[in-house]
Amino acid sequence: MKGIILFISCLMLIDVVVESRDAYPADWRGCKFSCFWGSSSWCNEECTSLGGSSGYCAWPACWCYGLPDSVRYYNNKCHK
């Protein structure tokens, strides 16, 4: 039983240390990367080049999964 608790605790610690987020990546102004329907392959390439696990076009902007914390993401200040 102690082994199971230790294992679960380690998994939780790894999740805290290797944190990532799902978000709209942003350019230098804080604005989203625009895309159109059917450009999911372009968004996937952009997201993986930023260190994310994958991405797709959630029109009108790219949505990325697993972005590292160091990547800038959309924060509503751009109003676009």
UniProtKB/Swiss-Prot annotation:
SMART domains: Knot1 (SM00505). GO terms for biological process: defense response. The keyword Secreted applies. Disulfide bonds join C31-C78, C35-C57, C43-C62, C47-C64. Gene3D superfamilies: Knottin, scorpion toxin-like. Belongs to the long (4 C-C) scorpion toxin superfamily. Sodium channel inhibitor family. Beta subfamily. This is Toxin TdNa1. It comes from Tityus discrepans (Venezuelan scorpion).
